[in-house]
Amino acid sequence: MNSTCCSACKVMKCDCAPNCIFAPHFPLTNLETFERLHRIFGAGNVFKILANLDPIQRETAVNALCYEAEALERDPIFGCVGIFNHYKNQLQNLDEQINSAKNELAAIIGLDNVPQYSSIPMPADFLTNKFSLHPYIEKMEGLDEVQKKELMQLPPVDAQVIVNEMFRKRGNIKICGGHGDACASTSGGTSATQKTLPFPQNHNQP
């Protein structure tokens, strides 16, 4: 057997031809990855998928197959769908927390001053590179304060003052919650927490 064969040919115990369809994507150092693919999908099925694609499309297909195989190995029932649902639930919870925070900010600084957050655009190489969150986390951590404010489109207000005011407001609400009439003397006779705001309330809050 050729000592420089790819991991696919090593697993299948065959000679690695110069034009081997697996060689560009499964070097010998990637043996564990192909073993997983072979175990989950079968080497023959992987070959058929790659053979029916243009060479420029194969790297994306290999990345997708590897991701799906790893997901199915971790969760044989749901696979990638289970991962998708997990992160979808996390995003929904974060969305509820953001809306709750917006409500609190609107009560303190006014609805017009609530920051409007922009989404981070998907990188152009997102589908061609092996998926990992670490590079994007490192990029976020490397931003300075000006870049962070530009990304989030923050208004020209002191964020620390807002946070301090929010916690002070929360403290007052907790204190008032146990003293009934002692809290009735607010300006205008209406508590800020009683205002009707356009953001959905988070019913999971204690």
UniProtKB/Swiss-Prot annotation:
The similarity annotation says:
Belongs to the LOB domain-containing protein family.
Source species, please? Arabidopsis thaliana
User: A Pfam family matched by this chain, by name?
Assistant: LOB
- Domain (LOB) spans 4-105
Disordered: annotated span: 184-206
Q: What is this protein called?
A: LOB domain-containing protein 35
Q: What is the lineage of its organism?
A: Eukaryota, Viridiplantae, Streptophyta, Embryophyta, Tracheophyta
Name the source's superkingdom.
Answer: Eukaryota
